Amino acid sequence: MKKILFLVLSASLLYSCADVSGALFAGGDGTYDFKNVHLDPKYQVDESKIHLLDLLSGEEDTIYALYVGDFAQIATDTIIVFLHGNTPSMDSYWQTAGLFSNLVEKHHYGFIMYDYRGFGWSTGRSTGAASMAADYDAVLSFLQAQGLTSDRMVVVANSLGSLPAGPAAAGGSSIPVQKLIMEVPQSTSNVIMQNATGLSLPASMITSYKFDLGQNMEDYAGELLWMHGTEDAVAPLETAEAAMQKHQGTYYQEAIYEGAGHGLRWDIGDEEWSKVVLDFIRH
């Protein structure tokens, strides 16, 4: 009887999770209230440099992106392209935007982040590798039209952001990735699925979203910084390590922090986090 009940529950779970967005992704509403009042005073920005963009992704979806900086800066300065983690919208990363916008000095670097389909105000649903690649491409097309080149682009992927960042770094980016920061990356769909369902089922049983971050890193020829905590229960260190250490590119750096969890920057502090990131950008 227990076995039959388990099979029934499993079948129900498989059916309900056939849509990847329901199983893997935590997309939701966003307010997009990007103002200094919500920032730590030391990370406040020039509010005239806050730009909310709507970009066409694929044939019919619209994704929303936040650019902080002067548009003219894109053609001359280093731009941070931030791929956020598994939260309802990029609202959760406004403080991160402020931090990046104040590295070195206020607006030394341009900064852009965006919501994947189904996150925040972005339309549609994130359904797999193709939809996430299309969203990334939409942002890169905008930056490329503004004059961004590969030698001035730094891609920063937080947690779930490793899903689009990996294939992009491995050759799927219209602006080739030369510098990549992987912060607490999700490295296998199995781990993400287990976190979402609480069951140790292979992701292939539930979703067609398969990704191989290890292969992506093996194929990535540029510079890589990997940052992780030893106590990360969301993106386990061991699985991330196996993927990251396949990198054989021009430069590899890892920063592993004892006792830190998935909220790495909060655990180690902004000063240490910023130092490691800035040193890598300047390398």
For each predicted feature, which ranges?
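Hydrolase active-site cap/lid region
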Residues: 164-216
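Short alpha-helix in the alpha/beta-hydrolase fold that links the catalytic acid
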Residues: 95-96, 213, 222, 236-246
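C-terminal catalytic histidine-bearing segment of alpha/beta-hydrolase fold enzymes
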Residues: 249-283
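An N-terminal hydrophobic leader/cap segment in hydrolases
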Residues: 16-56, 68
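Conserved alpha/beta-hydrolase
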Residues: 104-123
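Alpha/beta-hydrolase active-site loop
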Residues: 126-147
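Short beta-strand/loop motif that positions the catalytic acidic residue
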Residues: 220-221, 225-232
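The serine-hydrolase catalytic nucleophile loop
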Residues: 88-100, 125
